[in-house]
Amino acid sequence: MLRNIFIYLIIFNCSFIASNPIDEITFKHSDNLHNFYIEISGGTKEKWEINKKTGLLEKDQKNGRERIINFLAYPGNYGFVPQTLSGDGDPIDLIDLDESLPRGKFKEIKVIGAIYFEDKKDKDYKFIGVSPSGTFKDINSIEDLLYERPSVLEILKTWFSSYKKPGKMIFFRYIDKEEALTILDDAHKKWVRKKRKNLISKPLATIE
């Protein structure tokens, strides 16, 4: 009995039995930086997504056809923050403002804020991040971006409002860094709760 409990605690502390390899990547890189996974390289139009079951990066398909953005290419590297869970059941989306990088890569990212849209009346947050050593390394908040590079936010707002069918993505407001980090932390806690629930629901084999 005690050995069963001991094994349970070991597995419980090992990221709650990650369902795929991506889940093993930590939420934070350090105190001030998060990890970020690139699904779509900046300057490209093909839709790629992580398969939730296998953790493999695959071309996104709809009705048997590969999806390609019918608009201008992505204005930055696009992907997600691992070990988060948003309202639609997917990880938190993030766009990286620095140079284009190959898809399927992880990088450390400094979150500076977010843009709040609604998609079919559902909340859709698009988080904004910069590399701590890149072009925007001195930008630490969305206020800095508004002051130093206001056109960047206008580009992001216009792009996300337009890359789907007109009127589908409705812009509501910009979100400052403090609120964005709170939303991000809540999304991580939600991911942890789900993993814990999944673990508890899976009985372990008895070891004599």
What are the residue ranges of the model-derived segments?
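Hydrophobic N-terminal alpha-helices or hydrophobic patches in metabolic proteins across all domains
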Residues: 16-208
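Sec-dependent N-terminal signal peptides
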Residues: 2-13
